[in-house]
Swiss-Prot record:
This is Serine/threonine-protein kinase SAPK8. GO terms for cellular component: cytosol; nucleus. GO terms for molecular function: ATP binding; protein serine kinase activity; protein serine/threonine kinase activity. May play a role in signal transduction of hyperosmotic response. Together with PYL10, PP2C53 and SAPK10, may form an abscisic acid (ABA) signaling module involved in stress response. It is found in: Cytoplasm, Cytosol; Nucleus. Interacts with PP2C53. It catalyses: L-seryl-[protein] + ATP = O-phospho-L-seryl-[protein] + ADP + H(+); L-threonyl-[protein] + ATP = O-phospho-L-threonyl-[protein] + ADP + H(+). SUPFAM superfamilies: Protein kinase-like (PK-like). It holds the Pfam family Pkinase. Expressed in leaf blades, leaf sheaths and roots. Expressed in shoots and roots of young seedlings. InterPro entries: Kinase-like_dom_sf, Prot_kinase_dom, Protein_kinase_ATP_BS, Ser/Thr_kinase_AS. The C-terminal region is necessary for the kinase activation in response to ABA treatment.
């Protein structure tokens, strides 16, 4: 989950205290946001549910330790996410620099991950899957119109608001790439189950076309309740998953009832040659996608008009870049600890334990390198 908080032009505003039993920042009571509870953690740090004292609005705040963790992925996430304003995308609010962390403040989606919903249901009915897929494509289409490809679309990066008919919200733009700001993607990023074959070939690829493949994996999981390219005998063998992706080796189980139209759409998405794969505009005109399509998803202009501008002025790009530059400087306590532990050589023996594989997959299934 992604979250963050910052006051425009006031990087020194957030004093920190340390919570019981943890070495993570809590914004001081005098600050704008107050802690409600922790809501997640990952390689980045922790995400917390916070309350805006002025508006009483709940927000999600992602804390990333200052220093080397403020890398290109973090900067890309913030720069790209800041430009996106759409009902199916988690809203970026601001960044705050604390003495020890960079905090990214964003909209809170109280309905949790779409992944959690599918786990509870095993799989969705075709109508329910279509309802969420329509929203996913609406959000992805908007991203692409803004020249941003996500590159890590998956159920875990799609959140739901708390409404009775949940609205899907795309989050986590840490791997996203803008064709305006960046070159064509070359790096292998994302989660193996969702990665398009051309991404695995270590050549330049069209990030928008790769996003289409990932959307197809999401659709398949919703209607089937399993990943399309996992080996049924060894579902956690990620190397086999990668090989099956490269061979476009998948099937729909006989016991799963899916309409011919849905099967056709899936078959048009899972095409190994990206130049022959269905595009987002073509998906939006596909018969299966158009069935029961909500009126507000038919027109991009009407979707944009639903986006309410925040009361507070948005931080300028210059302000954000200044905060990011300062965030790359480690906190003083970390520098002292580094000096103290550096002389002990505690980590020397660990340097020889690097994996010798070309494609490095950790136990969670994340691709953990970039060419």
């Amino acid at each position: 989950m992604a979250a963050a908080g910052a006051g425009a032009g006031a990087p020194d505003r957030a004093a920190l205290t340390v919570g019981p039993g943890m070495d993570m920042p809590i914004m001081h009571d005098s600050d704008r946001y107050e802690l409600v509870r922790d809501i997640g953690s990952g390689n980045f740090g922790v995400a917390r549910l916070m309350r805006d004292r002025r508006t009483m609005e709940l927000v999600a705040v992602k804390y990333i330790e200052r220093g080397e963790k403020i890398d290109d992925n973090v900067q890309r996430e913030i720069i790209n996410h800041r430009s996106l304003k759409h009902p199916n995308i988690i809203r970026f609010k601001e960044v705050i620099l604390t003495p020890t962390h960079l905090a990214i403040v964003m909209e809170y989606a109280s309905g949790g991950e779409l992944f959690e919903r599918i786990c509870k249901n095993v799989r969705f009915s075709e109508d329910e899957a279509r309802y969420f897929f329509q929203q996913l494509i609406s959000g992805v289409s908007y991203c692409h119109s803004m020249q941003v490809c996500h590159r890590d679309l998956k159920l875990e990066n799609t959140l739901l608001d708390g409404s009775p008919a949940p609205r899907l919200k795309i989050c986590d733009f840490g791997y996203s790439k803008s064709s305006v700001l960046h070159s064509q993607p070359k790096s292998t990023v994302g989660t193996p189950a969702y990665i398009a074959p051309e991404v695995l070939l270590k050549k330049e690829y069209d990030g928008k076309t790769a996003d289409v493949w990932s959307c197809g994996v999401t659709l398949y999981v919703m209607v089937v309740g399993a990943y399309p390219f996992e080996d049924p005998e060894e579902p956690k063998n990620f190397r086999k998953t990668i090989q099956r992706i490269l061979n476009v080796q998948y099937s729909i189980p006989e016991n799963v009832d899916i309409s011919p139209e849905c099967r056709h759409l899936i078959s048009r998405i899972f095409v190994g040659d990206p130049s022959l794969r269905i595009t987002i505009p073509e998906i939006r005109s596909h018969g299966w996608f158009l069935k029961n399509l909500p009126a507000d998803l038919m027109d991009d202009d009407s979707m944009s008009s639903q986006y309410e501008e925040p009361d507070q002025p948005m931080q300028t790009m210059d302000q954000i870049m200044q905060i990011l530059t300062e965030a790359t400087i480690p906190p003083a306590c970390s520098r002292i600890n580094h000096i103290l532990t550096d002389g002990l050589d505690l980590d020397d023996d660990m340097d020889d334990l690097d994996s010798d594989s070309d494609i490095d997959v950790d136990s969670s299934g994340e691709i953990v390198y970039a060419m």
